[in-house]
């Protein structure tokens, strides 16, 4: 399985993984459905693991609760097993609820018999009344079953049952008997049940739920051994039990065999007859236990508790390996090996016995006292057996030697859950012989007292349904409320009617008068506007008297069309009181005669003016069609070049107007006729249909269709290829985005409602949801995505919305596949983007878009929009009547809460990975309408087609915001000015502190940890395993032809040889390091890489921005903070010693090239545990020396951004910069979640892998902080043109460049959040290339597309956050007690210092590091495993013996 898992883990392609997951899910579903019957419950993780060991799966998403779910699951599983072996004929069930037959999957038509005896009061509620009998009667079936009862009975019950029921042949029975109770052990399955012992009995407690507990006598455990039961059947009752002959007795035998066993639940098969059964009966034993031999007197002082054999062997080897095994050391070792959570399972007396026993073993000699057979001559060898016999007899008389004592003392007795079966013969004993094994005699009723303890008394009562109660409450409420007749009119009070005023009538009169005034005012405005239009048209007509308007057959030139003059001319009306125009929604008019005359005169004037305008328009014949889709079309509009925009274009003549097919809803036909969209019967291109069908059959395209069976794909292609032609009535509707193509169809569908044979096919699920929302009163299955429609079928009328986004050939294939389709309606835009197939081997990739084929059947193109305002629509060449100004803005910042449009699907997935779920591609946003959108511009934008750009630009109704995420490179080739010496670029103004130190509040005094004692360990126990594999010096050293071997393995001390000593003067190591760590390039290639990684840089920055809580808008530049950071950097530099400043003179000189870098090899001892004693020395690390002013400038920049980062970063993010271990401990205790696995992250070649993508990220980050542009350009220049003696370096991180730590940390954060989908509130700690998270987040799906474009590769390490497995961060372990140094790493480093003789110099530092763990004392047993405890103990002893005799952090603080 490990090899298979390794192969599966090697798959990195996300598509392959998706296919594997889909296939696995299809296999999982029937399996989970099968196990759901027995295990429908929500289980704990530990219980689920135990159940899986029994072959019982658990659904991790189940939420059904039970007090003892695991135990109940096993009970159900045994019933399921029983159901599979029971015959399909009537069976007698005893002590069983009838509803449990469901778990057996038993046919309810079988007339099974139920015999239930009410032993306890609650049995009345447990069993249905019709199944309860006064006493057990004769069993009339061949097979019977006793449920969870047999363990309370003795074999005499079996004898009586088979004796009184001659027809009975097979009896099945389930028992609940924990095998470990025979040894008085704790439960071997504590997650399923627990045990408690009381005198001569014990309690079985399922799931620690006392309500379901059983009480057993130890005598019940005899059932575990029963193999056969025999008895006699006297023919004459006069003979009694003693006086009989063979002829007078008939022999009977039943055979008992274990059928199945899960934990404490067992299924027995008891068969009439003397049959074969295994001599040994074995029960499941998860762990191996032993009991020490009973060697002490009195017997009570021996250790009788079964102990894990592993623990016993660890203790034995410990006491035999240490020099002196003191009593306290053995106790400490026992404390170390036993988990704190398991201590309550041991009594103090048992531990004393165990330690005493181990101390006894430690004092005995392990050297044999017997002679060997190899020494001596012939005579000696001949007499050797005699001597051995004499020595053996001597020890029997005078006592054993130490060696013989040790051999007998370590002869552990295994605890074996295997028993030899026994035969119970009642032929010569009374039937009550079983009770001889019981500690006392118990009546039959007492035996059955705890038989059924998990019943629910409420099961037998009928409860009133909730809806019935609510109905009664509603009825009571209605009765309390006086009824009101809806149709009853309000009567006026008696008396003078003139004095009565109806409030509703008064209100309506006021509303009527107000509305009339508003309508009249609107009519005046419209009349004036029509007069202006008429005047402008007349003016243009006079300018061109010889020209006439062109017909609708061709688009007229600019000279032929009327202009848009600004001339104003008042329209003279008969009265100053205009009336509502006919297109206004005026519900009320004044009833006076004067106002009626005004209304008639106003209508006449408006009609006349409107008709004059229409007569001058080139599209006057298309006005009804334009009005039908909501356009008045009375204005002339022009694009940017001055060309008039026609609202109707691409007219196709010659198409016959055919009748709609029979069965077409009249509402739909009416709307299409009004828009002049009559159907035309067209032939479909079968070649396109066959190409699509071939791709589907061969699973080259699609998502859902790939999951279909091969036979379905063959049926699809077969049906398409069988057709010679296919014609269908088609309505093609083309129009601009927002022109209302779908509006009329949706209106008709709302009128039609449910019950129609119409299917709407949509290209995306988002569009499907939009249609469902706009047409809510239809069946949900009317709207389908295109693959669902192909698989699930359609109606006889199919509407394809945005059909240009459907795969080429899909429409033809669907219509050919479903012959019942008689009418298709296509809505789309030939000017917008079309479907693009990415599969290179797909046949449809070479087909043209569907709009090319169907455009010749579209009667006209509606070039008008309701979506965009007039200014934007006209720039796009589209007619619009929306007034106002479209807001256009551009910056490098993203706006929040509005959709984001990006040029590529890859970019979309990456942005969605940052939490921007409303991200669409330019092409994929088709159908989207939003008030505001933001469009991301990058290097892919320029390669997008005009159709795609039109789609993106036409999405917004009010505002478009362009986001330019690339860096400005205009000043890239400019050089930095030469800088003066150190004294000239240092500022001498007064330094300002960034923030004042505020002393922390006094913490409450915590209760001190209890003292503990760690057991003594061998000095070499930690490093010995590394020394065993140590090679010779020159086998490990690096060798080069020019400089010979390196010199990293030094001295003859094997401890020192484990550690590689890297020195700056080692030429071989220097060149090996340069070859491994540095890569050369050239300035032009570096800059090309920088530009090519723009798309990745902005994704990294967006993830970083979200992770660190930076504001969405740019952070204004603060000169005050910049100067404070500069002074801080300067002060730190001047704090160096004078010698260091003098040594840096060369880098301070103006003659030092600002792009030049001096590279050195870092001198260090390599103390990483994973690099101890490596077979081959690894290359070292480089240090880069930059021009000093460059270091200080970019150091200031890094500190400036750090200042703002610390101000905004969330509390759950901790950056280990200028902090103390105490700070990290407090943070971890308040934020870290220790209840789940964690992830620690490291990288391979972190510095060298920070390429152009990381530089893009840094530039965007600097821009967000409003760093001056000249500083950003200087940083780009130094990163792309860094020169060493070998040439120009590739873009990478160099130690010593100024912002190394901050830049590494921020790149680490950006990469981690780009790769992982980290839940909100997750505790995270970062420092350079080290990081740790308190959860194991999932890898984002979008990261797989980005992974190959990043050089950076992470090395995640998952820890379980339990004893011995804690997340590591910068050499610190994050534990529930705070942070502490990794004891193994600390000990390894200490051993190096001790071997070099430098321990005295650094002892205080080691004591401080050790004290963070040492001060937790006894709690360390819960944190460290055995190996860590060994390292901790050895470190403590080394420091205590060589120092002041103790280790304590408070004491060290006082001392230092």
Swiss-Prot record:
Q: What does this protein do?
A: RNA replication. The central part of this protein possibly functions as an ATP-binding helicase.
(+)RNA virus helicase C-terminal domain location: 863-997
Question: Region Disordered: what ranges?
Answer: 536-564
Question: Which species does this protein come from?
Answer: Potato virus X (strain X3)
Q: Indicate the segments forming the RdRp catalytic domain, all copies.
A: 1236-1343
GO BP annotations of the record are: DNA-templated transcription; mRNA modification; positive stranded viral RNA replication; RNA processing
Q: Which family does it belong to?
A: Belongs to the potexvirus/carlavirus RNA replication protein family.
Q: Which residues form the (+)RNA virus helicase ATP-binding domain?
A: 695-862
| One Pfam entry name | RdRP_2
- Which domain of life, per UniProt? Viruses
In this protein, which residues make up the domain named Alphavirus-like MT? 59-224
Question: Which InterPro entries does the UniProt record give?
Answer: (+)RNA_virus_helicase_core_dom, Alphavirus-like_MT_dom, DNA/RNA_pol_sf, P-loop_NTPase, RNA-dep_RNA_pol_alsuvir, RNA-dir_pol_PSvirus
Q: What is this protein called?
A: RNA replication protein
Which keywords fit this entry according to its UniProt record?
A: ATP-binding, Helicase, Hydrolase, Multifunctional enzyme, Nucleotide-binding, Nucleotidyltransferase, RNA-directed RNA polymerase, Transferase, Viral RNA replication
